[in-house]
Amino acid sequence: MAKLTVRDLNVRGKRVFVRVDYNVPLEERDGQMVITDDTRIRETLPTLRLLVEQGGRLILASHLGRPKGKREPSMSLRPVAARLADLLGRPVAFVDDCIGPKVEQTAAALKDGDILLLENVRFYPEEEQNDPAFAEKLAALAEVYVNDAFGSAHRAHASTEGVARVIARRGGPCAAGLLMERELKFLGEELENPARPFVVILGGAKVSDKIKVIDRLLEKADTLLIGGAMAYTFRLAQGYQTGKSLVEPDKVDVARAALDKAAARKVQFLLPVDDVVATPVETGQVDKKGRPVIAYQNPRVNTDPNCPPDAAGLDIGPATVKAYSDVIARARTILWNGPMGLFENPQFAAGTNAIAHAVAQATQTRGALSIIGGGDSVKAVNKAGLASQVTFMSTGGGASLEFLEGRELPGVAALSDKPSSGGSGS
């Protein structure tokens, strides 16, 4: 069932609770927290402008980081309010809490077209607990609910699900924002009956992260192209040696079942024909997250399906790039989720970069519909400077994966269904 969207609403004179995803990267400079990438703020502007033009009184809510249910000044949304005001060219009020008398008074004083940004909802543990009383307090601020935070829609939290349920119970409309609407369109409707050939490119580290997606897409796709470390679990399932590559021995049966399903359904299931391997060496150092830093020596192209015993596979090789690019060039629908190798390291970024160019070229020259399914694939396309040359880039990480698995996302399920006979929706 299609969901109600902001286009269906009549919000003039009404207070609208808008859940956005302003979980932006911040860093400290001269004692101030500075936003280093405002993409997530920019992505909400069409929804906010539409609601402002329609005379809504906007109350924006978001999380930022993981403050673990307590006030953490470095994760305040105050800098976001200032940046949003700059981008919109109009004032954005900020209140240093998200519930309580001060918030209620500020919300009550809003006039048509005004915007108020609440403080980080995760400063309260009740947000992630989806606490009913906390959801009631947030919902008391507004008469209409809009969710434009697809990246958080897979979490049943107070601001993503609880508030919508309360407002709906009171008879208020709960709608998808324009960004959410696009996510549901491209990850949902467009993949239900895709133009063929439908080519799915899957990468990343673990088969366990993607197996449900693989299983579902084997029922829809014509070809699956596999890259990243997950390819080595499939190689192990085929009886090859994987050296020091990242593998999941406990997922070999799952990988074998996927290969069998592909064969039974006559889906082309392509694994790398060559790879870039290198010898991992411990440096004795740790990164910011306390993980050991590994250096890689003697990077080289390996054309043997077996990985050398002292080496790890870290990227797809040139013959694989050529084979995959040829398949992509003929595609009419392309879904890409996950990099082809350890692309954060320039030594092993060539495969991912080449696939990004192949997807962009198919989109531009053949008119293919290309969907970049969130997370690292989006980073890779941005890094290659090709964001404007693909059809759609998802803002979700875990949300995109869960949606592609066919799971109902709590934040989407809580939205009102579009009335089948038309109507204003409010």
Language-model segment annotations:
Residues 1-426:
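Active-site loop-to-helix "anion-binding N-cap" substructures in soluble metabolic enzymes
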